[in-house]
């Protein structure tokens, strides 16, 4: 889900070992610039409730109410995952991450929606060839029965399936 969760584990030792207080790390969140925010905001249904930040070269969305807490935790703890991975920005256009397709706050009007039949959806989830006629030119949100499956990009008569290799299905 999209709840706000934090977990900390402490190793129990046998003897009198010292308690190590983690040092504050440098900030890993770089606030998104004005241009980046404009591009990222068009992908979410309620951009006024979101804050956008870059971690390395990937942009993430955080709810405004949780951003400062997540930032503080990330500065002192090792964070495995946080926020909604929006994707990378190339030439002022977002290359969306799969997590964005799964985000319930995604604005479905940001890109054309390609509704697939069950057979076509299974082919998409297997990362097999897709019929270009089912997709609009450019980036598409791929759905089946109204549920988002991921993104695909049509370039002329070819479709680039952006479904992650690690999630594809092999037998069905």
Where are the language model's segments positioned?
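Short hydrophobic/aromatic beta-strand or adjacent loop that forms the aromatic wall/cage
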Residues: 2-7
């Amino acid at each position: 889900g999209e709840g706000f969760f934090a977990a900390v584990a402490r190793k129990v030792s046998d003897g009198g070992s010292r308690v190590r207080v983690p040092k504050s790390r440098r900030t890993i969140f770089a606030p998104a610039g004005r241009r980046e925010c404009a591009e990222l905001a068009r992908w979410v249904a309620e951009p006024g409730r979101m804050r956008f930040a870059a971690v390395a070269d990937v942009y993430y969305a955080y709810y405004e109410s949780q951003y400062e807490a997540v930032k503080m935790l990330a500065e002192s703890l090792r964070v495995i995952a946080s926020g909604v991975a929006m994707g990378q920005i190339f030439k002022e256009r977002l290359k969306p991450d799969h997590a964005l397709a799964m985000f319930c706050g995604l604005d479905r009007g940001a890109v054309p929606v390609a509704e697939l039949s069950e057979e076509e959806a299974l082919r998409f989830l297997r990362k097999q060839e897709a019929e270009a006629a089912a997709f609009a030119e450019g980036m598409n949100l791929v759905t089946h029965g109204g549920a988002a499956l991921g993104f695909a990009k049509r370039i002329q008569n070819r479709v680039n399936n952006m479904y992650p290799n690690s999630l594809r299905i092999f037998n069905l």
